[in-house]
Amino acid sequence: MELVLKDAQSALEVSETTFGRDFNEALVHQVVVAYAANARQGTRAQKTRAEVVGSGKKPWRQKGTGRARAGTVKGPIWRGGGVTFAAKAQDHSQKVNKKMYRGALKSIFSELVRQDRLIVVESFGVEAPKTKELKAKLAEMNLEDVLIVTPEIDENLFLAARNLYKVDVRDVAGIDPVSLIAFNKVLVTADAVKQIEEMLG
């Protein structure tokens, strides 16, 4: 199959398996959920009454004080006491094998092509790290909400895009399922397309 280059009167020959396969919604959903889960820290932790530092002594005698009976200062109803059902650190990570991950990326790229959301250009960059220059260049192409994918991170392009809302720059190694579906359009250079094909096999 062929992808038409937006900035040139030519087309790029690409693999049907990478850019023309059926959309596997269940697989993409599973990989996106796993990717988000793997980003979680899971380090929250609270102390139970057994873990709170403090004496085990009964604060006052059982009868005769007029106060409510109390057996510990570490109970959940006391200020500074333990938490009844204390949260503990958890590992939220989900295993996704390479075949599934690559399959999800292929599904996403194929769907982007079908929806005309994948824009392929011969090359893309800015001469200086100026937000104004990049904004004007994107406006010419009628692009606002866009992920720009290049073979390697162009520092000028990265710095120019850093202050633009809903514009991000990634190299091929830095793309992931969440970022690909988070933007309205994905702008990819021809060299990046070749790298993506090599990466996804």
From Swiss-Prot:
Q: Which domain of life is it from?
A: Bacteria
Gene Ontology BP, a term: translation
- What do the Gene Ontology cellular component annotations say? ribonucleoprotein complex; ribosome
Q: Which gene encodes it?
A: rplD
Give the molecular function GO annotations.
Answer: rRNA binding; structural constituent of ribosome
Among HAMAP family, the record links this protein to:
Ribosomal_uL4_B
Q: Which Pfam families match?
A: Ribosomal_L4 (PF00573)
Q: What does this protein do?
A: One of the primary rRNA binding proteins, this protein initially binds near the 5'-end of the 23S rRNA. It is important during the early stages of 50S assembly. It makes multiple contacts with different domains of the 23S rRNA in the assembled 50S subunit and ribosome. Forms part of the polypeptide exit tunnel.
UniProt lists the family membership as follows: Belongs to the universal ribosomal protein uL4 family.
What is its quaternary makeup?
A: Part of the 50S ribosomal subunit.
Annotated region Disordered: where? 46-71
Q: What is this protein called?
A: Large ribosomal subunit protein uL4
Show the InterPro entries listed in the entry. Answer: Ribosomal_uL4, Ribosomal_uL4-like, Ribosomal_uL4_dom_sf
Return the NCBIfam families for the record: rplD_bact
Q: Which UniProt keywords apply?
A: Ribonucleoprotein, Ribosomal protein, RNA-binding, rRNA-binding
Origin species? Shewanella woodyi (strain ATCC 51908 / MS32)
